[in-house]
Each structure stands twice: as structure tokens, then as C-alpha cells.
Amino acid sequence: MLLGPRVRFAPSPTGYFHVGSARSALFNWLLARQSPEGCFILRIEDTDADRNREEWVDGIISAMAWLGLDLDEGPFRQSDNHERHLAATASLVAAGYLYYCDCTSDEVAARKGDNKTPGYDGFCRTRALSQSPTTALRFATPREGVTVVPDLIRGDVEFQNTTIDDFVVAKSSGAVLYALANVADDRHDRITHVIRGEEHLPNAPKQMMLWRALNEVSGDEVPLPVYAHLPLLVNEQRKKLSKRKDPVATESYRDQGYLASAFVNYLALLGWSPRGDEEIVPLSTLIEQFRLEDVSHSPAFFDVKKLSHLNGEYLRALSSEEFVDACAPWVAPQTTSWRPTDREVPWSDADFDPELFRRVAPLVHERVATLGEVPGMVAFFFLDELVFDEAAFDKVLRGDPLGQAMLAAAAERFAETSWDAASLHAATVELGEAMGMNLRKAQAPIRCAVTGSLVGPPLFESLEHLGRERVLARLRSALTRCSA
């Protein structure tokens, strides 16, 4: 007797791990974790040999581990269940549920003529063909009645059987297709809930027909699962997320420095809301409150700006030490077991000072939305050769004699000022007042000369951590650069 929900996440390894797939995996996992007897299964549906790649399999498993979606069973590969699929096919053929068809797509189209009704016309249904190298297998769909899909999100969804054509379940090569392979594996695994994207809703009545047929021919009355078809994820234009145009790869968000906890929190809010108005929802609360019946059937906007805001909140909730540790793959990847893909740190190991980073990390902790932003904000601490924002340099130094005068005065005053943020701030205020400049304008040429940019962490604390010698050298170098 099954005591808890048995759910499976069954992705096809044909590309990067889509954020929609990540949400489906999460919702399955949340349901399983609500019961001590719940079971979360990963089954890789890899029967499409022409499109599957092993690197995509690895990507799925790696991304799920990053998200913390631990497995109770699996990962299994659907291709390992080939004998099970063949046995299911043979039993359905013997019972008359399947028939052989040798029609080509051109022949089907020619018979239709001007009739634009989609689907197969059932031409081979009564021809009693035998298996051959040119015959596929089709399911003989009932010609009458209604198939009702019980959906926890959408209610009962009715499909007139006349609108469901005799669909192919096995190719002429003998390869068993998704519809039958999926049902055979779900029955074997005693799946109780099928939670997936709404694009799979048209498959549900076909799979229910196959499920009932297999129950009959096997004598094993496995209960049909309950379905839950999740709403589409849409972009800012409220169109379905495009794999080509929209940032949909889960791996890319990990590489950009989003925290797994923030990403999971955000995924959970795509179509579902917890009780209350809080955006930050602990995982324990997600598990406790999640109900498929509360998921909306309306499209959910995948808002990267909102995700970034939420991630920033999660980052700011980290302690200083936790933040430093979290930054390690982006600032010192050689010291970690994982590093972001195709993201090179802009300094060498020899230039990186872990202790200096520990001291300056609080300066950027409150200012970044992702960990991937950290290297750009602290690079000037570790690079001997600054990378200048040339437009900024032209604006406040090369093209501004007053900015150059301020820089020369700062180089002279900073040589004797007490080396702490407060003293450096006071000295800059005094120099600016003498030149008729407010603090914002007075510090701009100093910031650009020392950091290469007009934006970044607090200036005077940064100067303190850089040290007098490096700051004075950069001020003088910038003055020389102005006349170059």
C-alpha cells in the first residue's frame, strides 16, 4: 500500500536545463517532501538518440544538485527500460489496442485533400497489416465518448475522443515512442501524481487511454495518477519563454552568481503564492504550505529583475563570513571544487590576496545583486594595471582641468594625511571646498584615478584598504595619463 505521493521528474536531455523544467522539478519535490513516505524520482527520458547528449544529462543532474532537490530513487534512464516497453507493446498488439500502419505522411495528406482536420484518418485501422520494416504501430483511439483528465490546477479537463487521432506509439524501426514508454514506466514506478508543464496537457488523454489498456491486458489495476499541468512561463512581452531569445538556462543563473536558495524561492513563486505577503519564503515554509490546488493556471512572468532583487535580499542576509565563502568561486576559483563556466577571474592567483578580500568584502556585500558582480567591483584592489572607463576618464580628468587640479592636490595632501577613511574623507571635503567643489564632484576624479571607474564601493574605505603607497602611485599615474 502506497502511503505517500510518488512523483517523478522526467526531463529529456536535449538542451540546457530550462527554468521551466527546474520549476516542474521543484513542485514535484515539494509534494514528495510533504510526507515522510513521499518519493521523488528522477528518470531521464533519453530514448531520442538523435537529440540526446550526455552533457545535457550531466547538466540536469548537476543543476538539480545545486538546487538541493535530492532524490529518493534514480537517476534512472528510460533507455534502460527498453524490454519493458517492448513487452507493453506486444501485449497491446495481442489485445487489439494497437494496429500496424504503413501510411506515409504524403499519403495521409493526399487523402485529406482540402480537409484541414489535423491528425491521422485511420486508413489502416481495419487493414489488418502485419509487422514489417515499413509499418509503425498506432493506438486505436475510441471513436466515441469523452476522456476526462483530472487536473488539480485546472479542474476536470474534457477531451472529445473524436478529436484524438490514432497516434503512433512505435516507429517502424521498433523504437517505442514517448507516449507509451512514459506510461509503461509510470505504471511500473507506481506514480501517483504527474506534475509537468501545460504543453503536455494534450498528451494526458492519450496516456490515460494507454494506462487503462495496460491495466486491462496485464491484470494489474494500477490507479491512474492525478495530473497537474503547470502554467506557462512568459517573458516581458507576455510570450512563451524562448530558448533562443530569453535567458532560460538554469545553469546560467548559477554561473552568474544567483544563490540556489534564492532561485528556489523565486521558482516557487512562479504560479503559486504562500500565505501572507512575504517574498522571502524559507524552504521549510515552502514545503509546509505548498498545494497544487493553489497553483494558478494563468501564465507566470519570469521576471529576471525581480529574481535579481530577491537574490540581493538573500545575499544581504548572509553573514560577512558566509558572503566571503560564497564569493570564492568567482574571486579565487582555484581554491574551490566548482567554478562558473566561461567566467575568468580578471587577476592571477599571485595577485589575489584572500585576507585583503576578506577585509573589503563588506564594502560590496550590500551593493551586489549577484555574486558574479563581485569581481568587477573589487578588481582594482588586485590589479596592478587598471582597466579604465575611458568615457569617465575623459569626463572628470582628461577633459576637466579642475579635476586634474583636484587630483594633484589630493596626491599632495594624502601623502601626509592620517591613513583612515574618516581622515581621507575630511581631507577631500576640505580640498573640494577650497576649489569650490562639493564632495560628489571632488571625489569623482580621485575615484576614477584609483579604481578606473566612477562607480564602485565606498571610496574612502577603499582608499584605506588599498594603502597609501598604491593610492599615491595611482593618483600620480592618472595625472601623467591626462597629458599622454
Predicted stretch roles:
Residues V7-P13, L42-D46, D189-I195, A427-V429, ...:
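Glycine- and acidic
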Residues L267, N311, A361-V368, F381, ...:
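Short alpha-helical scaffolding segments that buttress acidic/His motifs in well-ordered protein cores
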